[in-house]
From Swiss-Prot:
It comes from Nautilia profundicola (strain ATCC BAA-1463 / DSM 18972 / AmH). A translational regulator that binds mRNA to regulate translation initiation and/or mRNA stability. Usually binds in the 5'-UTR at or near the Shine-Dalgarno sequence preventing ribosome-binding, thus repressing translation. Its main target seems to be the major flagellin gene, while its function is anatagonized by FliW. Keywords: Bacterial flagellum biogenesis, Cytoplasm, Repressor, RNA-binding, Translation regulation. This is Translational regulator CsrA. It comes from the Bacteria. PANTHER family: CARBON STORAGE REGULATOR. One of its GO terms (molecular function) is mRNA 5'-UTR binding. Homodimer; the beta-strands of each monomer intercalate to form a hydrophobic core, while the alpha-helices form wings that extend away from the core. Belongs to the CsrA/RsmA family.
Amino acid sequence: MLVISRKINEKIKIGDDIEITIVSVDKNQVKIGIDAPKNIPILRSELIEQITQENKKAAKEVDITVLKNISDIFKGN
């Protein structure tokens, strides 16, 4: 991991298209601004983890009856 010290309004450039700006620094919080092309997803890691957990939970809760009914439709029953 690369660790860089920055002050408010200083920037970090990643490649040609991504720029990170330090917007503010408080006691336990740093606010950053990210300029990147719209086709590059920018997500907080805790949201990715939450979505992953919800998807796993939903997959476990699939009703077997529903799956059988879908299977019957494709079989022509």
